Amino acid sequence: MTDSLGELRAVLMEVRERLGDALGYAATARDRLSDALGLLSDLDGQHSEPLVPPELRRARDELERGLQLISGGAAVVADIGQRL
C-alpha cells in the first residue's frame, strides 16, 4: 500500500507541475492574442474593412475559458494531494 500511495503522490506532483506549465503557456498565449487584438483594433480606423477577424476574439475567449478550467483542475489535484 505504501508503494501505491507513494506512486500516486509522485503522479499527482507531476500533474501539478504540468498544469502549472499549461497555465503559464495559456496565459502567455492569451496575453499575446490580447496584444494583437489591441494593435489590430488601433489600425482598424485606418482601413475600410475590419482587420480583427472574429476567430481571433474567439481564440482569446477560449483561452480564457481554458485557463479557468486548468486552474480548477490544478486546485482539485492540489486538494487531493493534501488529503493523501
Regions found by a protein language model. Name each.
Residues 2-84:
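Amphipathic alpha-helical hairpins/coiled-coils and adjacent low-complexity
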